[in-house]
């Protein structure tokens, strides 16, 4: 759904790799910092100019902007496995920080985390391999929980399709490791 008055697109996908309940949804919200000058939906193999909502399977949204050459349009994106409202709540986590501020905060966290181990070796290739492997090992498990409107930790259960209290983690990172 395109919401022009809020420079926003909301929706969900049911795409998954199997083994999840029927109510599985990955809800998303995208908010842009410029108004739309063009909007359309895509569905049934056609582009419907001016329409703001599509409900069939395999649909999409198209938006356009009036920009000057080189002007950047920023998009703020959040998702939730719980609800569209929760996706909106998750978007608030970004606050008013810019893309560059968020990227720098991420770099600082990774530098601090990777810097906990010091490797002494003059071979740049070995250092690069070690820190690349350390980085990948720290990507997992992934957090699969969210904070609700009351600040409580909740998660969508891929086992029964319910929203339950507490933490949940997923993806060990070793699913494609063979012995």
Where are these regions (language model features)?
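Beta-sandwich/jelly-roll carbohydrate-recognition scaffolds of carbohydrate-active enzymes
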Residues: 1-171
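Aromatic-rich carbohydrate-recognition surfaces in CAZymes
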Residues: 170-179
């Amino acid at each position: 759904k395109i919401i022009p008055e809020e420079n926003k697109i909301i929706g969900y996908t049911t795409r998954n790799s199997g083994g999840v309940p029927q109510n599985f949804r990955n809800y998303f919200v995208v908010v842009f910092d410029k108004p739309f000058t063009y909007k359309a939906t895509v569905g049934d193999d056609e582009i419907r100019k001016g329409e703001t909502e599509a409900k069939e399977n395999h649909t999409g949204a198209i938006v356009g902007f009036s920009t000057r050459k080189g002007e950047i349009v920023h998009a703020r994106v959040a998702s939730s496995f719980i609800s569209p409202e929760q996706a909106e709540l998750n978007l608030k986590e970004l606050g008013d920080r810019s893309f560059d501020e968020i990227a720098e905060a991420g770099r600082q966290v990774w530098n601090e985390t990777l810097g906990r181990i010091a490797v002494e070796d003059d071979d740049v290739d070995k250092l690069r391999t070690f820190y690349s492997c350390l980085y990948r090992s720290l990507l997992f498990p992934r957090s699969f929980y969210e904070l609700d409107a009351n600040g409580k930790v909740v998660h969508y259960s891929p086992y029964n399709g319910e929203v339950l209290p507490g933490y949940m983690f997923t993806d060990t990172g070793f699913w494609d490791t063979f012995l």
